[in-house]
Amino acid sequence: KGTVGGKVVLVTGGSSGIGLAAAHKFAEAGAVTIICGRDQDKLDEACKEAKARGYQFVAYPADIADMADCDRFVQLLVANHGGVDFLINNAGRSIRRAIESSYDRFHDYERTMQLNYFGCLRVTMGFLPAMVEQRKGHIVNISSIGVLTNAPRFSAYVASKAALDAWTRCAASEYADQGVSFTTINMPLVRTPMIAPTQLYNN
């Protein structure tokens, strides 16, 4: 509570899974908790759940895989909230498919990079100028333990997260003396809607 109370926290992909669980924790601690996602119904349901628990979310529809929508969304939050104090880059896409099965599916790699890497960068770089000007800000990137291993069938997903991890290490060194800090969390496998299509996980 001493860290986020009264602060503006944005959780991308905050309408379900890890993002929603994190959003509840931030709101419980007194943060102005903003969530975004593509599905308005899920956003509404998340807000209803928060209200039932005695706090509230501020919800915005946004598609982090769409660069123009990222720009629109960042500008909207700067106008409405003065930017954010904490950015949780959680929105992501996972694909479980062998490389051999992807020879004619190069779009698997493109769409995974679009959301997991380029989208995160677009949002982050949109908020960085204000963070630097205020000399404060913390960016948390939700990555994967797969980056630390050699996970078969997850090359598209792991590569996109590895790219984000590498960028974050570089950014952390560049902004270390400007009041902006970065954290990477290499999450293990978590049972969320994102992994639901893979029936293997049910066992």
Segments and roles (model prediction):
Residues 15-16:
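Conserved glycine-rich cofactor-binding loop
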Residues 29, 149, 170-180:
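Active-site-adjacent segment of SDR/Rossmann-fold oxidoreductases
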Residues 40-41, 61-73:
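The beta1-alpha1 cofactor-binding region of Rossmann-like NAD(H)/NADP(H)-dependent oxidoreductases
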Residues 94-110, 153:
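Conserved mid-core segment of classical short-chain dehydrogenase/reductases
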Residues 124, 160:
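Active-site helix of classical SDR
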Residues 144:
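Residue(s) in the substrate-gating loop at a strand-loop-helix junction
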Residues 173-203:
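SDR active-site lid
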